[in-house]
């Protein structure tokens, strides 16, 4: 079971996918938006290739937690995507995900041109990782004492 995370923008959709254990998120691609039909087809291809069973879509809330027009558009897209893919689509607070993604890329000394190419998928990765961390059962935390250091 893999989960796909999405950062929905007006021009692009950042896409990330979890590992098979649901522990980590990896940025996969950025979909250039052309039409709803093409967007859904591109996301269906990624979902099929990675055996996605659940989708987490970033919900762009205002800093005070209220919803604006972008949040309403995300809700509508989530409904359409759920019907198109036949999977559950869950909305997840995406506040500051792009800021965190930009900061991470700057700290990694990624060039401006490369940042433009990957910023949306890194933001999707932050959204998905936040969701994965929040939904991880408490007994799956890693404790070094639980493992032998000897081979």
Curated annotation (Swiss-Prot):
Belongs to the YqgF nuclease family. One of its GO terms (biological process) is rRNA 5'-end processing. It is an enzyme of class 3 (hydrolase). It comes from Myxococcus xanthus (strain DK1622). One of its GO terms (molecular function) is nuclease activity. It comes from the Bacteria. The keyword Transferase does not apply. This is Putative pre-16S rRNA nuclease. GO terms for cellular component: cytosol. Keywords: Cytoplasm, Hydrolase, Nuclease, Ribosome biogenesis. InterPro entries: RNaseH-like_sf, YqgF, YqgF/RNaseH-like_dom, YqgF/RNaseH-like_dom_sf. PANTHER family: POLYNUCLEOTIDYL TRANSFERASE, RIBONUCLEASE H-LIKE SUPERFAMILY PROTEIN (PTHR33317:SF4). Could be a nuclease involved in processing of the 5'-end of pre-16S rRNA. Pfam families: RuvX. Its EC number is 3.1.-.-.
């Amino acid at each position: 079971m893999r989960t796909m995370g999405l950062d929905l923008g007006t021009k692009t959709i950042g896409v990330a996918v979890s590992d098979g254990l649901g522990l980590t998120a990896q940025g996969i691609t950025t979909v250039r938006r052309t039409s709803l039909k093409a967007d859904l087809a591109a996301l269906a291809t990624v979902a099929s290739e990675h055996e996605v069973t659940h989708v987490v879509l970033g919900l762009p809330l205002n800093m005070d937690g209220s919803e604006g027009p972008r949040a309403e558009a995300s809700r509508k897209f989530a409904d359409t995507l759920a019907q198109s893919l036949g999977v559950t689509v869950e909305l997840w607070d995406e506040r500051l995900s792009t800021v965190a993604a930009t900061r991470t890329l700057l700290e990694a000394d990624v060039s401006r041109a490369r940042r433009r190419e990957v910023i949306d998928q890194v933001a999707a990765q932050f959204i998905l990782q936040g969701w994965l961390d929040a939904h991880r059962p408490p007994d799956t935390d890693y404790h070094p004492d639980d493992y032998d250091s000897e081979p």
